[in-house]
Amino acid sequence: MRITAAVTVAVGTLLSSFVVPTGVAEAAGAFPPSEKIFPASTRGWVSISHGPEFRQRFNRTQYGLLLKDPSMKPFIESVRKQIENSNGGRLGRLGLTLDDLLEVAGGEYALGAIESPTGKLATVVLVDTTGREAEARSLIEKMNQRMVEQKGTKVAVNGGDSLTVYQLPPGENTGRTTEQRVAFALSGNALVVGDDSALLTQVIGTLGQGRGDCVGSLPAFGEVMGRCQNQVPTSAAAVRWYVDPLPFAKAYQATNPPREKRKGPDYVAILGRQGFDAVKGAGGVVVFDDGGHALRHHTMVYAPPLEGRQPDSVERFNLAARMLQFPNAEDIGPQQWVPRDVSGWTSLQFDLRNAFVTVESLVDDIVGEKGVYDDVIASVKEDPDGPQIDLEKDLVACLGSRATLITDHTTPIGDDSERLLIALEAVDPERVAATVAKSMSIDPDMAKIDVQGNVAWELIDRSMAIPQLEVELPGGAVPHADHDEDTHRRRTKLREREEKLLPHSVVTVAQGHLFIASHRDILERVLATKGDVEALGSAMDYTQVATELNRLLPGKAATRSFTREDEAIRPAYEMLRQGSMPKSKSLTGQVLNGILGDGKPGTVRTQRLDGSTLPDFEMVRRYFGTAGVGMQSLPDGWYITGVTLPRSQQEPEVARRPVTPPQ
């Protein structure tokens, strides 16, 4: 249910090949490091320090071998043709692939998403072509030819280090109605490509000495790279990246407005109003084929406390951002009831009690009406027809600070195969159980059942996901107060939306935890696990990943996770292959439908990627390994590191229990 490193690297490389960048090795290249060239208005930046070395390292990994597997060739060619025929916006219309750009890279290859004076994002690709001059000239010719095929009009050609600019008509498949511009130049041994000719002129002018007001001069950039960059050797051809989250999101919105105006809140604006602009920057480094790791990454989210605030105080930020409290703990390994053969496991330390209080302003802002959150909490307590529960005292105060997420799937793969279980630590499990029973027993849509000797409550009707206990935290395209004067109708819509998330949910209290499962079968498996050899903690592949994480991130941690990439990616792979991804009932499928759909309720989007040429999953399973991630909370943010281990380093495949969906 999550996107693993395999998906990010393998599939993402295919779909975004024309913008995947690389960066500079050392100062001997055709220009200074790109972070000294791109301006301080850069909102997103990626660099690979040495293109040829990066290419060799990537090709040696399981991801590189996967892309070179003959069985994948039809799918890869299909994706490339789809990209070429899509006439995609921005630089996509140049028809460049990742191989095209890496072929001309003799040093750094970098990409910048830069906010222009208009508030929109402009894209710049910068490649050091030292030693690859002939290939670079050939690529320039290819781009000129592509522009002619796209019916582009050359509007400016300068002498010397010429900057070539083409005006392009709206693409047939882009959904855009305005013309676009694409510009490129070969200045010495620097290839510069972008969609803003004025910005490219500035970049070309700074290739010699760089600029003072560069992205590298930003304090947040310095803090992020200072934490992460020294974690890898300079010879590793590392991928370095940086993003200024909210400004990037705001500029992206301005650059890519929806085709149709949709009702609902502006989440980017809301996050800014609610104090989440306290996150000043995020970034890090990624290396491939690194001493036994297929992939290793180090990330820093830089969020220093506001001036005059204490780093360990819940008041370090303003308003809803105060919920960003993830206390470190000594041991957050998998509990004895986590089954040995699950696809993925994550444990997170989270100050739930603080979040319950601080989320108030965020909920009200999303709904567009002050007091909605308090009204919901009060109605649960005071409504004579309700459960009459004090959520804060009877539930939240009885829960601890640890949350666990388990993901898995049933076979054969179908639109309802994915499984999810959330476990919240209970410091007073008896009181939590009493609260759950009081709430569920009066709800006609919940059936009292027995699961491994424990009282549980199963949803038998799709009227709501987790009745009464589910505090209404609306998400997605939520009706807003400005667009719906009928409060009851609006809140009914919110409940109907929540219903879709866990339509078969089961709730119980056992093993000192409140369990919320997407389906009864995953809860049965968890409660039947007796520890020792049945538990995830005893699996050798988990132990190997945990050992590496402990070495890279020793001490207390706020998060730990483990993923078996093959099992994690398999449901999405099979659904993509069947052409059924838009029908998926999983959370992942619903999120994709929300992002890629037309925003109209009840409609099923068309799958945009043709997966019919994908090989049988068993033919490519061997390329997927295991992955782990850990996070530590710091006084000025959060530090995250993770690894992916190739299958060759693992024990024989963990035998999965034969799990089939209930009839």
Regions found by a protein language model. Name each.
Residues 1-4:
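Positively charged n-region of N-terminal signal peptides that target proteins for export
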Residues 6-21:
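Bacterial N-terminal signal peptides
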Residues 25, 494, 517-518, 545-663:
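Extended terminal
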Residues 25-178, 222-280, 300-416, 433-446, ...:
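Structural boundary/hinge residues at secondary-structure and domain interfaces
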Residues 53-54, 180, 185-190, 194-214, ...:
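Hydrophobic, ordered structural segments
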Residues 93-97, 101-108, 164, 251-254, ...:
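Intrinsic, low-complexity N-terminal interaction/targeting segments
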Residues 176-255, 495-588, 595-598:
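A conserved glycine-rich beta-strand in the N-terminal activation segment of trypsin-fold
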